[in-house]
């Protein structure tokens, strides 16, 4: 199940966690008032953006 994420410009996108990725790697779960929203931790931000690009390519 994808995790809904926000990057710094507040662009909504989906991030499929890698195997073994845990909830504690995200800051402020739900603190934006949206169920399941997460701020990616610094180490996972690049991965999340990479996944977003893959999704955009797949959808277009």
Curated annotation (Swiss-Prot):
Source taxon at top rank: Eukaryota
Name of the featured protein: Putative per-hexamer repeat protein 1
Organism: Mus musculus
Gene name in the database record: Phxr1
